């Protein structure tokens, strides 16, 4: 065998050996990674992912319900407008018919009485007094005819306008009914979708170990509800937040406060928002419930709505609606009681309580908690009500 052939064979064998050991090394690394991966972490991550999807659907469902309520109100208003316009049309037609009868009578009298032109009276009058009488009668008849014709014309115009208004309101009522039907169908679809997602989330929750469930169910420390700093914005911005538009937890407690807990001022500057925060903090430990808005269980926007209700402020049960109501607030100017919304679709909400903390109802299996405000995901915006 020639030298170059032996060299070529040896090179092929060497390449094969290197490829084998390289493949073995990579496979061993992947296997080791799989062996070292914590199944518990995978289960929790999957639960969080599924719960997040269910929360998005829940808040979209709330928004769809608000949209349906608005469309139904528009439909009721359109139906009422249609009824009013039809009543006005009937009245206009009745008035027109009345004047039509009067005009017909005047026309008949004129026809039966002959010509009413002044020159005819002059030419046919047999005496000055008869001329005066005829001219007087002609003036009265002409005035009556002119008045009746003017009223007849006005009634006709009114009837035409009433008919046009009735036609428009009928079209508006049909459009409102169609829009309401479309929104109702969308709402029903989201309701069905949510029920499936809830079943999947609960199934994933069952897969957790008892220890994991216990850890999730721990509400953590309950802040005192004695007082809240009326203005305690975070001292720094979280990573990735634009300057002046995204806070992070403060590092030092306000004067008079416990370390790690917001300070609450009993009365005065906080106003209604103090009552909002106090109400929300009384629910720390309450369970998460899809669509919940009462102490038996809350979803994120349900907790916000309920807490504000306790202060006499009515808010919608929808994080997306909360993200667009009230007054916008820069994150550097946050005050306790401001509403925070999260993610690009504003599908999560919580209540800022000061010192970089917020109270919220986050997800299934996790009770209402106080957490750092930047721990729930990217902040969408902040609103003050």
UniProtKB/Swiss-Prot annotation:
Concerning InterPro entries, the annotation shows: NLP_P60_dom, Papain-like_cys_pep_sf, PG_Endopeptidase_C40
Offer one example of a GO biological process linked to this entry: proteolysis
Answer yes or no on keyword Hydrolase. yes
User: Which GO cellular component terms, listed alphabetically, does the Swiss-Prot or TrEMBL entry include?
Assistant: extracellular region; peptidoglycan-based cell wall
Q: Which residues form a coiled coil?
A: none
Q: Which residues form the active site?
A: 300 (nucleophile), 348 (proton acceptor), 360
NlpC/P60 domain residues are: 270-385
For this UniProt record, give its keywords in alphabetical order, as a comma-separated list.
Answer: Hydrolase, Protease, Thiol protease
Ranges annotated as biased composition (Pro residues): 235-257
The family annotation for this protein states: Belongs to the peptidase C40 family.
Which protein is depicted? Probable endopeptidase Rv2190c
